[in-house]
Amino acid sequence: MSSARFDGDTWDLASSVGLTATMVAAARAVAARDPEGAGAVATDRFAEPLVRAVGVDFFTRMATGELDAAELDEETAIGMRHFGAAMAIRTRFFDDFFLDATASGIRQAVILASGLDSRAYRLPWPAGTTLFEVDQPKVIDFKIATLSELGAQPTADRRAVAVDLREDWPAALRQAGFDPTERTAWIAEGLLGYLPAEAQDRLLDQIAAQSAAGSRFATEGLPDVNDVKQEELRRRMQRQNERWNRHGFDLDMAALVYFDDRTDAGTYLAAQGWQVTSASNSELFTQHGLQPLNGDDAPFGEVLYLSAVKDTAAAA
């Protein structure tokens, strides 16, 4: 299957790759409506109003609860709940990553491809923390305007860096006040699969080049990437599309992802001297008191969540 992506393609939050950020925010809103389950793991009070502001009917109805179980066939209703739970687990992992990083004294953070991420507004950042959000200009501008209309105030010194990650984003980051001599906490949430293999390696190299010793990085992806895993992910995404197509959502999500041979991020970073730890989504479900999603219940199969620390030798 070829990708629908091309060199220089751009998007907003209602099209192409940008729509995946709206999809994830809608899933966070679904989780929030389950306070005894997924909503107890992670809650994003800004998810629903942000999705509503984007204006994609299917995701608006999903986020607001208008697309409820009575309207859905059983398979789609269950799949939607599972998707919300999976995104709650993912959200909590990256929330905890930042909280742990700042507890260690880190006061500089970067969110790459920030989309509709609201951590700048909802996490309890320590005084003196600077948080950089990097994404395409249309995405950055929309989120700033929408959250301003909602009366939301950042809980950190939030700095928007409106630049495509295929451009010289490190220069734009430094221009916004980023200090590469300070320890940094980086996240690339839901990003790497939308990059070709060589672009993924380049991104990791760029992060490493700007990371002082003791900096931290977190991301997620498929374990042991190979043709079988890629085909499994493609099949799962196609099944998700078929469910949602019945309710007016018409976008081939699999066509946005690059299914090419690549070194997984954990292996790549470990080879460069980073200390890498990992946890599977099944382990995280159990840790947070949720029933793990097995087999076809898991929207994207088994996902591995990675956290890495750059040691002194890697920084030398």
From Swiss-Prot:
Keywords: Methyltransferase, S-adenosyl-L-methionine, Transferase
Keyword Methyltransferase among UniProt keywords: yes
Domain of life according to the entry: Bacteria
One BP term from GO: methylation
Any one Gene Ontology molecular-function term assigned to this protein's record: methyltransferase activity
Positions with a binding annotation for S-adenosyl-L-methionine: 135, 164-165
Class of the enzyme per the UniProt entry, highest EC level: transferase
E.C. number(s) listed in UniProt: 2.1.1.-
Entry's family note: Belongs to the UPF0677 family.
Role, per record: Exhibits S-adenosyl-L-methionine-dependent methyltransferase activity.
Name this protein carries in UniProt: Putative S-adenosyl-L-methionine-dependent methyltransferase MMAR_1069
Species: Mycobacterium marinum (strain ATCC BAA-535 / M)
